[in-house]
Amino acid sequence: MKKILFPLIACGLVMPAVAEDKVPRTPSPKGAQVRIILPKNGKTVKGPVRVVFGLKGMGVCPAGLVLPDGKPMEKTGHHHLLVDTEKLPSMSLPMVASETLLHFGAGQTETVVNLPPGKHTLQLVFADFAHIAHNPPVVSKKITITVEAKAKKK
């Protein structure tokens, strides 16, 4: 029972701060940029799709990693890939992983995604150690790709 109760209490203590939008945001340096290197915007590709992330002016660091004094490492973060999303997630709250919001909290700089045939959009958001977008947010341009249907075997 204690194993279940403690996480519930912890969530109860944390959630009010999140709900009130009082989560501090980590500053991003001027000129910081994130981009999708591959695939190129407008291209037709075969699945599964290799996506390579690019970053300028900041460093990649695993989520949750802090300095010995408990403060986050400056000018660092990790990638979040938005797949087929209409709008950006909240920039002031932790981003919640889903089928359309993929986390790369181990510091990954590329991935392979299985997308069905058809048009798809991809966009990156670079976030801090707590999965919260920097201030100002470091967000890539949204790209559109087309995934080819696999040829049927005869």
Language model features with spans:
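Short beta-strand elements
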Residues: P136-K154
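Short amphipathic, basic-aromatic surface patches that mediate peripheral association
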Residues: G54-K71
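A glycine-anchored, Pro-Gly-centered beta-turn/N-cap motif
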Residues: G47, G77, P116-G118
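Short, compositionally biased P/S/T/A/G/V-rich stretches that sit at domain boundaries
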Residues: D21-V49, K56
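Short acidic/polar inter-strand loop motif in beta-rich domains
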Residues: L88-M91, A127-N135
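A beta-strand/beta-hairpin structural motif
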Residues: S92-T111
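Internal, hydrophobic beta-strand segments that form the core of beta-sheet-rich folds
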Residues: L115-H131, V139-K142
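Short, well-structured beta-strand segments within conserved domains
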Residues: V49-F53, T109, G118-F126
